[in-house]
């Protein structure tokens, strides 16, 4: 199904300065919507005609209200903004809580006060997944208990999603009408120009850190191309309307490309496309999990003095090494979502166009240095973190 047009509607996108928020804004703009991007940082790209940027902090209710004041009537809010998805951000619990929970509360309050009829929330697989194997799961699965989440980002996204879905059907503070809400739970996002995960991966490749893979080679995870994700959000917004029977009201939807794949095999075209050798060494998942735990503990101790980028966190080990994928049946049936096929070729070309790829003389000596560091870290994890009574539940 082609995503619908939005003639003369004004939409507001929180997190509109980020990769996905900006792409969603451009997609909506091309369909005739007037778009307001609300974020603490401005997009790196030039704003197309019909798109307006409002600078503000989602944690500040006054900033949120200012964003809404820039439009006579907002027809739909796409609440994309979040914090703490990966890397060292994942260890900043205070800011994660303030943005993901407090920011969501501010958005819901503004929607009810301003009479916004529709809200689409960008959630995550992680509200359900916390390290357990899930094969072809669906939306009937219960939320993972909050105390079982291995990271605060996933915990707060779960809290925020519940708040959004519980707000479905609430009456506006003034006048007639109610707020209708739904949640999109995406897989890992990729696409040319993605600025959160792919540059970090390429950095590891270029520095010689990608020297091994881990976990079961048969483990499967999922990804979603940015354009498929934008399409799903637009369809979800339409499915909150009366002419669609409000079918999406109060509902969550898993969204991916619909092609479960081994995490490391997914990135093989990127590694080899940039001229590097895909690693043949495979390490146990438990060993890498213990290493990630040590890295997190080290960051906890020295992070205030040296806020280094963790090589991996425990959640990232789970997300990359443990099978978890979900059915698209509900999204297809209720939203009309049909993912388009994509691969990593455009991503490879983007990185090449921006000066990446193997070719520097002396790189092998750098690889040897990082090999030594990695071996030392792995040996340290074995010698200092032996817990015979502890088992990793996957």
From Swiss-Prot:
Q: Membrane topology per the record?
A: Multi-pass membrane protein
The EC code for this enzyme is 1.1.1.-
Q: Where in the cell is it found?
A: Membrane
Quote the Pfam families the UniProt record gives: 3Beta_HSD
**Residues binding NAD(+), per UniProt:** 157
GO MF terms, alphabetically ordered:
oxidoreductase activity, acting on the CH-OH group of donors, NAD or NADP as acceptor
Membrane spanning residue stretches: 283-303, 367-387
Entry's family note: Belongs to the 3-beta-HSD family.
The record's section on PANTHER family has: BIFUNCTIONAL POLYMYXIN RESISTANCE PROTEIN ARNA, SHORT CHAIN DEHYDROGENASE_REDUCTASE FAMILY 42E, MEMBER 2
| Protein name, UniProt field | Short-chain dehydrogenase/reductase family 42E member 1
């Amino acid at each position: 199904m082609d995503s619908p047009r939005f003639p003369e509607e004004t939409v507001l996108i929180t997190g509109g300065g980020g990769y996905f928020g900006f792409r969603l804004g451009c997609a909506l703009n091309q369909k005739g919507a007037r778009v307001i991007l609300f974020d603490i940082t401005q997009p790196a790209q030039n704003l197309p005609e019909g798109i307006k940027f409002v600078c503000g902090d989602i944690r500040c209710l006054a900033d949120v209200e200012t964003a809404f004041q820039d439009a006579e009537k907002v027809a739909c809010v796409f609440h994309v903004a979040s914090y703490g998805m990966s890397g060292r951000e994942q260890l900043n619990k205070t800011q994660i809580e303030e943005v993901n929970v407090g920011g969501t509360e501010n958005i819901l309050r503004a929607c009810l006060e301003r009479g916004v009829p529709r809200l689409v929330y960008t959630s995550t697989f992680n509200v359900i997944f916390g390290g357990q194997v899930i094969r072809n799961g669906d939306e009937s699965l219960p939320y993972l208990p909050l105390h079982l989440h291995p990271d605060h980002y996933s915990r707060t996204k779960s809290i925020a999603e519940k708040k959004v879905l519980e707000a479905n059907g609430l009456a506006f503070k003034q006048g007639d009408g109610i707020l209708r809400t739904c949640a999109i739970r995406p897989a890992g996002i990729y696409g040319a120009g993605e600025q959160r995960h792919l540059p970090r991966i390429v950095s590891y490749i270029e520095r010689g850190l990608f020297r091994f893979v881990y976990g079961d080679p048969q483990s499967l995870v999922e990804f979603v191309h940015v354009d498929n994700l934008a399409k799903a959000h637009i369809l979800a917004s339409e499915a909150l309307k009366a002419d669609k029977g409000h079918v999406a009201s109060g509902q969550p939807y898993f969204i991916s490309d619909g092609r479960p794949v081994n995490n490391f095999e997914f990135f093989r075209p990127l590694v080899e496309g940039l001229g590097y050798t895909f690693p043949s060494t495979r390490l146990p998942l438990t060993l890498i999990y213990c290493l990630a735990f040590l890295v997190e503990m080290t960051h906890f101790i020295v992070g205030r003095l040296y806020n280094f980028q963790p090589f991996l966190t425990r959640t990232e080990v789970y997300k990359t090494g443990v099978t978890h994928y979900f059915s698209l049946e509900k999204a297809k049936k209720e939203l009309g979502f049909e993912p388009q096929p994509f691969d990593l070729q455009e991503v490879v070309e983007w990185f090449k166009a921006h000066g990446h790829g193997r070719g520097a003389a002396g790189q092998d000596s750098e690889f040897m240095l990082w090999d030594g560091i990695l071996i030392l870290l792995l040996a340290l994890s074995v010698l200092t973190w032996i817990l015979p009574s502890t088992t990793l539940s996957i």
